Amino acid sequence: MEDLHKVLKKEKYRKVKFKITKTQHLLIKAKINGVSGNFILDTGASNTCIGFESIGYFELSAKKSKTKASGAGATGMETQISSHNHLQLGSWKNTDFNLVIFDLSHVNEALKSYKAKAVHGIIGADVLLEGKAIIDYYNHYVYLQ
């Protein structure tokens, strides 16, 4: 697998470490507006999301949205949107990033029931697609270009 790293480095990919939790989720650190948080890396989530309780923590400016969110066993959830944020995973950056904000309490309650760490949000397919992501499950790295 070291060859994979060398090939991707030549293609200007950035390597970001993740951990596998007790619940088999991929846990990754990210910074939003310079503030570090814990996130689930979720290929099945269409958008990167933050919980309502983290609006102040990440210094987000939130606006109401007509879009309803669904996922992880919940549907029809109210959402807000936060535009023009700075997102960083390892050394990969996006300086004009939009986030969906919604109630993540059902996610964190499920994690707590397994004695797993609560998360601030979910890194979704929007980031993975933009970064042309390659996930190395064996070595626990996501590569972003």
Locations of regions flagged by a protein language model:
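Pepsin/retropepsin-fold aspartyl endopeptidases
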Residues: 1-145
